[in-house]
Amino acid sequence: NQFNGVLVDLACLSFGFKVVPIPLNSTPEHVSYIINHSGISHLFICGKIGKKIWGEVKNSHDIIAIDMSEMNTTSNYAMNWNSFISSSDTVEEFDVDRLLAKVDINDIQTVMYTSGTTANPKGITFDQINIISKRFARALALPDFNSEDIFLAYLPLFHTFGRYFEMLGSIFWGSSYCFAESPAFNSLLNDFKIIKPTIFISIPKRWLQIYEMLQIEMDLFSEDEKIIRKRLQQITGGNLKWGLSAAGFLDPGTFLFFQSKGINLLSGYGMTEATGGITMTPPDNYVHNSVGKALPGINLKLQNDGELCIKGPYVTKAYYKENNDKIFKKGWFHTEDIFEEKNGHYFIIDRKKDIYKNSRGQTIAPQKIENLFQDFDAIKSIFLVGDGKEFNSVLIYPDYENSPV
């Protein structure tokens, strides 16, 4: 995450240039696939990981690569950031009004690729209606967010919450958007003290770490309420009012703890295909184990088997260059997740999909890992588990007849 990257993203979104964020946790093979599949012509690169991956795949792609750092360019890149900015002086007849007039809000504006699956990544398409309508939906669900708020942002900009909720949301609300120095927990603790955010969106792991930090320092069941609240304010900078735990499971007791200490911690259910959130726990109305109620502007229905289907202005219309017949039926997107609904609140029961997310928000594909063990004679069957957990566990049933042990 860096300022120059945000500028590139916003410029492309504003002028109708198709923009494709590439997840930094992609393998070099998947990066090559995304470049070819999406038809990228210009690639903006920053950070050690991005540069390392580009170094491995650059010989396979005839595209213009731009180093977003402001150091001298190297042989790996056509130009660096300063050269790129200076090149604008040579552009003739650049007509802003003409470019804006050509933008069609129904055209594909951005493609976000999935990561962590067994096959090639899927490109999820969004037009400007998808992006803009989601901003109004979030504003209706969170009417108290405003220009006085400060986001401490560390979620990656190739992630829907980092890109749509934090980056575009802060612009919509007129709030301050502050980059975290690093996603590491100790670094975030330092950022809390410096930035003093009012809003913090995170994977469950970080909320749990804050809770455990307090738990180590004091007995949370017997300590005076004022002392606990004061220490929590010291850790989070003193101004934190709102939180969101996204992309994984967080125990209801942890939610209630933060809410009882003055931080309105919210949760929800979402997916990239819906520009992020689909449901959200209403402020001051948390129900145990619920992922909340439907966000404004989206239609939800449950199939006979409980599968959740969604439709609305901020739901993608298609996967890029894919056969969409199985997942889009009569205008409804099938999530492949099983739910129950009680009094408007939704509860996740099971997943039709094989993939799951751990407590760090990382997407895990069990089959891909399980297949790595197929050739071991000593293993008869294997099962990977870890949905919502901090770690993954492999359950192995040995083949006692063929095992040398």
Regions found by a protein language model. Give the residues of each.
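Structural core segment of the AMP-binding/adenylate-forming
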Residues: 14-86
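Flexible, low-complexity linker/hinge segments
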Residues: 74-108
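Conserved AMP-binding A3 loop
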Residues: 100, 109-135
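Conserved AMP-binding/adenylate-forming
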Residues: 1-26, 154
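Conserved AMP-binding/adenylation subdomain of ANL enzymes
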Residues: 132-150, 157-231, 239, 264
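Conserved ATP-binding/catalytic segment of the ANL
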Residues: 294, 298-303, 307-358, 363, ...
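Short hydrophobic alpha-helices that are characteristic scaffold elements of the AMP-binding
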Residues: 9-15, 37, 159, 168-172, ...
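Gly/Ser/Thr-rich phosphate-binding loop
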Residues: 198-202, 210-286, 299, 380
